[in-house]
Amino acid sequence: VAGRFDPRPTRTTVRGGHVVVPGQAPADRSGGLGGRTRRWAPPWPVDLGLVLGPLRRGPADPTFRTTPDGAVWRASLTPVGPGTLRVSVRAGVVEGEAWGPGAEWLLEQLPLMLGESDDPDAFEPRHRLVAVARHRRPGLRLTRTGLVLESLIPSILEQKVTTDEAYRAWRLLVRKYGVPAPGPGPGAVAGRGGAGGGMFVMPSPRVWALIPSWEWHRAGVDNKRASTILRVVQVARRMEEAVGFEAGRAQERLEVVVGVGPWTSAEVVQRSHGAADAVTVGDLHLPGIVGYALAGDRDADDSVMLSLLEPYAGQRHRAARLILLSGRTPARRQPRMPRGDIGRL
């Protein structure tokens, strides 16, 4: 299996996909901020940082914010237009408020986004480390956004570069070519005005297609990744159709595009579909982390990793996330990969 995906990209999965969300502030915001609202009481504990964390592309992601009152804000390009969603949890009740043409769509998707379609009870730990990690994180459920491009484009940017480089490119391109997020934005909670609150909705497929070559260069995106994104947005409708497929078939649809391989397609369906079995192959560090955690083998490759995860068939992505969240990772043996910036050339 490993040979199929070599050479492995110099990029690693976000460590567990956990974002720290401040504790819920006691202040009563029952009046809202003028958006459409929805309340939902799931019969399980919701951990916004664990569930929504994989959707954040770096601490300065213009499409994702957390605020001191314990809320998570997201700006998305939905099938019906741009939308902003604020999500918080109070006494076990999820409170959603949304703005923009995509507001109703985002509120309708809210339960799925917070893991309603996930089935963590189907997961049976086979290793003590995994069992302990699961016990310590009862709020871990897999998000299902129902959106493909918002995960596909940043995943392409993350191919074969450091996360810092990819996050910078995403941040620069979304801020320059996206649109301000609808609604008051996170600043309104702190009494600061300004539409969108500094958040942006990612560009539409048409706008991505019109970005000049020198702007990709300035953002540090090489021609190979830029060309892949251009190919993807040319068939944007076909890409989004994959939401209606089961995860394996969706990956096949995405991989029809030249430049989108198993690593990228897995990173997408983990988010768009909540795919519990879509383990990331071709990652620089994940095989060594899984190998070290489960067998003490820090030099494991994809084939070894998949063999170790075989007892978790059907739930391999969840197992990998729990391993990442356990914190049991091998000590670094070499300096971090230096950040490159082709924009300076």
Positions of the model-derived regions?
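HhH-family (HhH-GPD) DNA N-glycosylase catalytic core used in base-excision repair
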Residues: 2-345
